[in-house]
């Protein structure tokens, strides 16, 4: 809820929206749906079959006053019931509101919050988390991707200086966290000794074995000028960041990402989203030209990998060396994009690509920014002026994208054909077989409007066979 004291001018990610998870919480064989909420309680819907869902949020004990962002599901205590881990962030400095939450499934449609007990109630500004077995010891460790609240995008030369001069408590919130599972119901923060201690603006994370050494690596998609991180697992509890030698370039305003094999060669590829419109008018009115001086400083003086403002799709050539082919595939420009999902929706054995997008305020509009600057010069820099200008900004919902993978590195925009035709401000997305018919359905979390639930009709039209594991 925007107010003069609390809006996109006070918190850069005010309009970023929330995630969604699909998980069977009561072991009845039907996948249920959990929605994280910004400025609104989380919601848990029980699947009653035939695409009918019951809201059990209040009785389940998963509603909260926190600003929830990403959501992950895991059976953290190995009792056979899926638990829910919620990342929190928002326009606040209150650690009680920032603390991530772990909802332990009691097996009776209720949950108990136990983040602090497990030692994973991270109080940074968290975007998403992923559970994975970092050290191949048979239990799941946890990587929590955080983002800095200190944005000096306009003056990148001073950002690190400003960050380092902040009090330790504030500075540490700019770093993501790696937790090692001790196997006894507790986790330890091993970020510094593992080699992951780097500040950033994490908005997307993907975990996979990119270099084929048998250990899971971590890719972090960073917003603004900080380059994406590609952490390669050394198999001894440490990681080496080495994106510079693995890709020719990356996205600039990196958002969501996903890892999957798009050409069925057995190697894991990587999609990363940015915010460049495909529409010529929006491209010219909303996007700045590349800043040559900034680009030169970041690449030549800082040594960052070159970053460009478009989606990237990196084809794995082996051992984690990638060729970027986003433009070649026609997936490079999808507007202000958020979630990327690489998954086979039409059961043809090729991974398709879903992209959610939309941003509530066109705050990158050149005319709007010029008018704001004029008002600042003539009336002074105040929150009241910014709030007034925000109310005058365009609010343009746009449609999401789905690209059909035809094989042989050919993607077609199938958005309209497959039913993605309603404009929205969409962020989090998840897939799962909600009706157990052998194809994957999609749930999308929208900002300030009802969610989208897409029923996949593939199996109504095909005679494919499938195997279901229960």
Which functions belong to the PLM regions below?
Residues 1-470:
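Acidic, glycine/proline-rich Ca2+-coordinating loop motifs
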């Amino acid at each position: 809820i925007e107010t003069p004291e609390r809006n996109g001018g006070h918190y850069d990610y005010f309009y970023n929206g929330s995630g969604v998870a699909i998980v069977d919480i009561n072991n009845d064989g039907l996948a249920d749906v959990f929605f994280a909420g910004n400025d609104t309680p989380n919601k848990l819907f029980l699947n009653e079959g035939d695409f009918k869902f019951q809201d059990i949020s209040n009785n389940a004990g998963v509603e909260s006053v926190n600003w929830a962002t990403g959501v992950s599901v895991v059976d953290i205590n190995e009792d056979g019931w899926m638990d829910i881990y919620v990342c929190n962030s928002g326009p606040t400095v209150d650690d009680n509101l920032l603390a991530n939450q772990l909802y332990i499934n009691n097996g009776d449609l209720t949950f108990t919050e136990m983040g602090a007990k497990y030692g994973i109630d991270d109080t940074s500004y968290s975007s998403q988390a992923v559970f994975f077995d970092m050290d191949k010891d048979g239990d799941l460790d946890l990587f929590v991707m955080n983002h800095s609240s200190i944005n000096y995008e306009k003056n990148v030369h001073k950002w690190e200086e400003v960050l380092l001069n902040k009090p330790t408590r504030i500075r540490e919130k700019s770093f993501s966290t790696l937790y090692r599972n001790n196997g006894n119901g507790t986790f330890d923060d091993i970020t510094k000794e593992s080699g992951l201690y780097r500040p950033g603006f994490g908005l997307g994370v993907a975990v996979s074995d990119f270099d084929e050494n048998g250990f899971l690596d971590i890719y972090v998609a960073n917003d603004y000028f900080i380059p994406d991180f590609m952490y390669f697992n050394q198999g001894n509890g440490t990681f080496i960041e080495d994106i510079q030698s693995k890709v020719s370039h990356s996205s600039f305003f990196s958002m969501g990402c996903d890892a999957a094999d798009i050409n069925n060669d057995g190697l894991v590829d990587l999609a990363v989203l940015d915010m460049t419109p495909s529409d010529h008018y929006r491209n010219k009115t909303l996007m700045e030209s590349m800043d040559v001086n900034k680009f030169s400083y970041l690449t030549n003086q800082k040594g960052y990998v070159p970053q460009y403002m478009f989606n990237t799709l990196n084809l794995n050539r082996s051992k984690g060396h990638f060729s970027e082919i986003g433009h070649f595939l026609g997936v490079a420009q999808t507007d202000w994009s958020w979630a990327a999902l690489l998954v086979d929706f039409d059961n043809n054995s090729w991974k398709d690509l879903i992209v959610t997008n939309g941003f509530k305020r066109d705050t990158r509009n050149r005319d709007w920014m010029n008018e704001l600057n004029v008002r600042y010069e003539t009336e002074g820099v105040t929150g009241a002026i910014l709030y007034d200008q925000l109310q005058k900004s365009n609010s343009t919902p746009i449609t999401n994208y789905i690209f059909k993978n035809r094989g042989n590195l050919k993607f077609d925009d199938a958005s309209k054909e497959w039913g993605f035709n309603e404009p929205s401000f969409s962020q989090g997305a998840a897939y799962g077989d909600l009706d157990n018919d052998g194809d994957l359905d999609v749930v999308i979390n929208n900002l300030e409007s009802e969610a989208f639930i897409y029923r996949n009709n593939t199996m109504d039209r095909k005679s494919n066979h499938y195997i279901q594991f229960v």
